[in-house]
Amino acid sequence: MKTIAIIFDPAHGKDVKGKCSPDGRHKEYLWSRDRINNLVPRLKSLGYDVYVTTDSDNEPGLSYRKKFATQLKTENRKLLISLHNNAAGSGLSWMSAQGVEVYTTPGVTDADVCSDIILRQFKKDFPEFKMRFYKDSYLERDKEASFTVLMGSGYMGVLIEWLFQDNKDDVIFLADLKINRKFENSLVESIEQINEHFKS
């Protein structure tokens, strides 16, 4: 019996400018939706109720995403996972920043527990990637921001910034099918651990 319902939130729509690599090869909207399209059936097969804030390739608006998660009716505790790629610049030039970040809202909440589980699993599965922790200690590994999609009520929200789409090396990783499958596996394992945590 699963105790949490998963709400996936895909990255910015394809009609939002600048959400790609400087050479245009990598598209954040597509990477995010491809991951979610693979994750949804896997998690459903494990017994989870899984939802997606939008099935459009275009941008529905940040408030729409938040409203979807807030108003979703389910008997289970809700966990929203927003999947993004990071960027250090405006998207016009290659930059040097690399690695992985996870964001929650300001303050310590149950979302911090979720983000800590996710980040520890990422660190285990991807020792070659830089984990950009706020501080490498329990419930402080995530970074905090008042991102609209995280600010709704009645759900735990985490926003994953998976690698930098304006770093040449990270873009190679983002295009690697094996790494993408490994990312999906790592996130599924994290969700299983989160589910177990909130059973008690």
Residue ranges: model-predicted function:
Residues 1-66, 96-98:
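Active-site histidine-acidic residue metal-binding/catalytic motifs
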Residues 65-75:
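Short, well-structured alpha-helical segments in soluble
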Residues 34-40, 44, 113-128, 172-200:
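Long, well-ordered alpha-helical scaffolding segments within enzyme catalytic domains
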Residues 13-15, 56-60, 85-91, 107-110, ...:
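Solvent-exposed loop/turn segments at secondary-structure junctions
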Residues 15-27, 87-117, 121, 125:
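A short, glycine/acidic-enriched catalytic loop
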Residues 2-4, 43-50, 74-80, 128-129, ...:
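Loop/turn elements at helix/coil->beta-strand transitions in domains of secreted/extracellular proteins
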Residues 52, 133-136:
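A structural preference for short, hydrophobic beta-strand core positions in alpha/beta folds
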Residues 7-9, 20, 26, 72, ...:
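Active-site-adjacent mobile loop/cap segments within catalytic or ligand-binding domains
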